[in-house]
């Protein structure tokens, strides 16, 4: 993956933004993005993929919407049903990662809009996600996308000696 570096032209480049479902060829870029984005502030445990095969087993092609500019992936939105139960198939659980150099350019919002459209097309009735209480920027982003508080798991994690709440949020898909 070519390095995604901060660049004054990032804002202009977003006019070339594309969004599509993930493909096998994206694995390398997505693994690097995970290593960059998920840390103790954004996840209860850093994500460290040991191999491309492991990554593809956990994140098969089509299980993410990826956003890119030219050939570079600058963000993704992963989605899956929370369990294998038939009674849970109307729900997608989400996670979003945007490269730090491409944040606050509307990429996350465009991914979320695309996800809402895809969910409606696929008969999904509810989107949900979890966010650490120590990540106020992510919480504000999800609220700006219409997500509402569903619950709070108090002191759910102990990260670097600090107890952190896990905030549960949801968005209804009107169908």
Predicted regions mapped to residue ranges:
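Hydrophobic pocket/interface hotspot
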Residues: 30, 34
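Acetyl-CoA-dependent GNAT
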Residues: 17, 24-25, 36-101, 112-113, ...
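Short glycine/proline-centered loop/turn elements that form peptide/ligand docking sites
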Residues: 112, 135-138, 155-160
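Conserved GNAT acetyl-CoA-binding A-motif
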Residues: 119-130
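Conserved catalytic-core motifs of GNAT/GCN5-like acyltransferases
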Residues: 81, 128-131, 143, 148-165
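Conserved N-terminal entry element of GNAT/NAT acetyltransferase domains
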Residues: 1-25, 167, 173-175
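Short hydrophobic/aromatic beta-strand or adjacent loop that forms the aromatic wall/cage
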Residues: 62, 164-168
